[in-house]
């Protein structure tokens, strides 16, 4: 007689509340653990946090904030190619060792044009150049502050006499000394022929000192990734993102283990060979192996675990997240392809478990959707502050451009869409910096309990399977909470 269990059940499916990590002998203090890890084959993070490519989670403001904390943000694709590329460019210009392609204004431009540029790029000064890009002056907001004639040429009000400049070999310490000595905030960098080649600002030097753990490229710019779908304009979108300076591209679909995604991966590797390509989402080792064999520089693991995802109940498909992460980790163990554990995280302890199961980093959505930097709308409800948060499979998000993620790009009638997500609200949480601080603290504590000095060492940790009674015992019980902690709320609160 055939057995359903013997014939059809191929694995146990466990997730975060099914297990606990077993404490081990430790010589590791939480404050001494090393959190550096890899986001993709060639991109190193200083903390293992990636913000999700969701339209209520990551745009430039979030990407800047998470990169300054040591992680990386993935800018969502629910916008035009031009707007997504612009969001990437904003991140790349937010902080620099030296700005290699500074915004400039040509001779003859008006005060109105200078003010427009300053407002668009949120900058306080613009080098003025001639037709051959020779530096002829610099105009700052101080020059424009009381100027009433908007049609007046900037040539008449810019600083041009005794301009303080430096050369490309100047390091940031020497540049800081020059800025301090001359009491200026912007230092143009020129070549031997006085062509403008860069700009060093006091603000960037200060930021670098304030955030030494920031995730930066080799030019001192914040790192940023961006999501793309599997559509006819994917390669055009990728090229625009590369031109804007993107560090990695995420091919973001609901089912990464599919022919169209693998074909798009091959096209991407041929089209932009010097950019890391991350592919997701998947839930099995077989999927991971196929993507790695076809050139993926990282894989994203998670089908249906997210708080706003309904894939598992709508489609009946998915793998509980810890089992999925471990299956993928086992398949990729002998490769140099990292995995990103995406979804299902509610507490910092879940992050520790996801990394211990094999993740190199975790993707976070709901954990940061309530922060100041998220693009979601602010909502006041019953006197409390919330922010909107929706799945990319929700009807609202699909109407704005995420239909292709769920292979419904050709569906024109909104009534014919089959959503795999919901829209809702999450409590306001303050800034990303405050949230990441608590998550880093929980991760450090967990690694200390496990005796793991690095995330790679954390992969060796062991788990114990627990019952529902064990889950209840793990949470505060038999008490009324009178003082809330910044890193804990009761389930379903």
List the predicted regions and their residue ranges.
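Short beta->alpha transition motifs characteristic of CBS
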Residues: 75-80, 123, 127, 135-150, ...
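Glycine-rich phosphate-binding active-site loops on the catalytic face of alpha/beta enzymes
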Residues: 68-83, 246-258, 297-315, 345-379
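Bateman/CBS regulatory modules and CBS-like beta-alpha motifs in cytosolic regions of diverse proteins
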Residues: 33-45, 52-54, 83-121, 128-130, ...
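Alpha/beta catalytic cores of nucleotide-metabolism and tRNA/nucleoside-modifying enzymes
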Residues: 1-25, 105-106, 167, 227, ...
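Short beta-strand/loop segments at the ligand-binding rim of alpha/beta enzyme cores
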Residues: 44-51, 97-102, 217-227, 268-283, ...
């Amino acid at each position: 007689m055939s057995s359903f269990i013997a014939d059809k059940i191929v694995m146990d499916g466990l997730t975060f509340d099914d297990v606990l990590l077993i404490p081990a002998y430790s010589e590791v203090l939480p404050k001494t653990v090393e959190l550096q890890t890899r986001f993709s084959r060639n991109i190193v993070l200083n903390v293992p946090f990636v913000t999700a490519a969701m339209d209520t989670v990551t745009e430039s403001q979030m990407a800047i904030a998470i990169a300054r904390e040591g992680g990386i943000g993935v800018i969502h694709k629910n916008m035009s190619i031009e707007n997504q590329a612009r969001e990437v460019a904003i991140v790349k210009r937010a902080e620099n060792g030296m700005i290699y392609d500074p915004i400039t204004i040509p001779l003859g431009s008006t005060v109105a044009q200078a003010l427009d540029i300053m407002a668009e790029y949120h900058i306080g000064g613009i080098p003025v150049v001639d037709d051959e890009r020779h530096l002829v002056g610099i105009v700052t907001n101080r020059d424009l502050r009381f100027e009433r004639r908007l049609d007046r040429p900037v040539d008449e009000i810019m600083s041009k006499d005794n301009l303080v400049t430096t050369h490309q070999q100047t390091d940031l310490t020497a540049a800081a000394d020059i800025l301090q000595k001359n009491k200026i905030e912007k230092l143009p960098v020129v070549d031997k022929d006085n062509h403008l080649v860069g700009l060093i600002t006091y603000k960037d030097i200060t930021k670098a000192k304030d955030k030494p753990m920031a995730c930066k490229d080799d030019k001192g710019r914040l790192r940023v990734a961006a999501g793309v779908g599997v559509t006819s304009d994917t390669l055009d979108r990728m090229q625009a993102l590369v031109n804007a300076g993107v560090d990695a591209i995420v091919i973001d679909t609901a089912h990464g283990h599919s022919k169209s995604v693998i074909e798009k991966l091959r096209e991407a590797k041929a089209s932009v060979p010097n950019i890391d390509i991350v592919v997701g989402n998947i839930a099995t080792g077989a999927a991971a192996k196929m993507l790695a064999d076809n050139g993926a520089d990282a894989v994203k693991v998670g089908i249906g675990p997210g708080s706003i995802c309904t894939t598992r109940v709508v489609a009946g498909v998915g793998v509980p997240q810890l089992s999925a992460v471990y299956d993928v980790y086992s398949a990729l163990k002998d490769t140099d392809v990292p995995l990103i554990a995406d979804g299902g995280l509610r507490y910092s302890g879940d992050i520790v478990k996801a990394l211990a199961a094999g993740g190199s980093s975790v993707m976070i959505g709901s954990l940061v959707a309530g922060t100041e930097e998220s693009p979601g709308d602010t909502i006041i409800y019953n006197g409390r502050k919330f922010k909107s948060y929706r799945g990319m499979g929700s009807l609202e998000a699909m109407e704005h451009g995420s239909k292709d993620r769920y292979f419904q790009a050709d569906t024109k009638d909104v009534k014919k869409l089959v959503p795999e997500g919901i829209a809702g609200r999450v409590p306001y949480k303050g800034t990303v910096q405050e949230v990441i601080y608590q998550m880093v603290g929980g991760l450090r504590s967990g690694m200390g309990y496990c005796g793991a000095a690095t995330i790679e060492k954390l992969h060796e940790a062991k788990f114990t399977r627990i019952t529902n009674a064990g889950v209840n015992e793990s949470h505060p019980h038999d008490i009324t909470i009178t003082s809330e902690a910044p890193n804990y709320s009761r389930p379903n609160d």
